[in-house]
């Protein structure tokens, strides 16, 4: 009687290495960023998809503070594009690990906060618990229409959920980065 080698195998749980998890987190986060930036470019060029029936997609920059805010956001876009790639590419090792880690944690926190606050704002308005939501603004002040269509409301919620997804991905990247550093025995 012959025995096959498969009969002698033991099943062990399949676990991914910390580096594989980091690479997957970095790639997923980078794809999210590319889509995020593509939509913003589309909206800056006048596109309306994703905003429902709202008359304007990007408010005009009327003062210096708005222009400075836009420059800060542009800087965040640039950092948010570089960091996910730097996590798992060799050139990323030139960037101190703590900077990459903090960028992931801060980006994940801000995106999650923005996304979840938007969802909560919509829920409070939709249920009638707070007619002006968390912002204190009416629909007309926020969207340009007093009675937005379901399409507009769903579009706004989809954008909020996309922000929250970005937050989750950056937080995943932060955790994976920490695990990868510990597995390599580096803490700095």
Where are the predicted features?
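Core segments of alpha-helical transmembrane spans in multipass integral membrane proteins
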Residues: 64-86, 105-109
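Hydrophobic cores of alpha-helical transmembrane segments in multi-pass inner/ER membrane proteins
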Residues: 73-82, 158-173
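C-terminal TM-helix exit segments that contain a strictly Trp-centered aromatic cap at the helix terminus
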Residues: 35-47, 109-131
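Loop-to-transmembrane helix junctions at the membrane interface
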Residues: 86-109, 113
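Individual transmembrane alpha-helices with interfacial aromatic-anchor signatures
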Residues: 23, 103, 140-166
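Cytosolic juxtamembrane helix at the C-terminal end of the final transmembrane segment
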Residues: 88-92, 127, 168-188
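Membrane-interface interhelical loops and short amphipathic "cap" helices
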Residues: 47-65, 126-154
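Transmembrane alpha-helical insertion/packing segments
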Residues: 2-72
């Amino acid at each position: 009687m012959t025995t096959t080698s498969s009969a002698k195998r033991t099943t062990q749980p399949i676990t991914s290495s910390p580096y594989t998890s980091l690479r997957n987190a970095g790639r997923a986060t980078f794809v999210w960023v590319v889509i995020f930036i593509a939509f913003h470019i589309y909206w800056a060029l006048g596109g309306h998809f994703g905003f429902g029936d709202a008359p304007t997609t990007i408010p005009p920059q009327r003062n210096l503070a708005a222009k400075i805010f836009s420059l800060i956001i542009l800087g965040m876009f640039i950092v948010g594009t570089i960091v996910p790639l730097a996590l798992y590419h060799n050139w990323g090792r030139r960037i101190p690990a703590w900077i990459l880690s903090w960028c992931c944690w801060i980006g994940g926190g801000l995106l999650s906060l923005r996304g979840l606050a938007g969802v909560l704002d919509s829920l409070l308005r939709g249920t009638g618990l707070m007619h002006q939501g968390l912002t204190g603004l009416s629909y007309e002040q926020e969207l340009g229409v007093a009675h937005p269509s379901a399409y507009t409301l769903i579009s706004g919620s989809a954008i909020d959920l996309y922000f929250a997804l970005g937050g989750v991905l950056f937080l995943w990247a932060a955790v994976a980065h920490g695990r990868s550093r510990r597995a390599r025995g580096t803490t700095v």
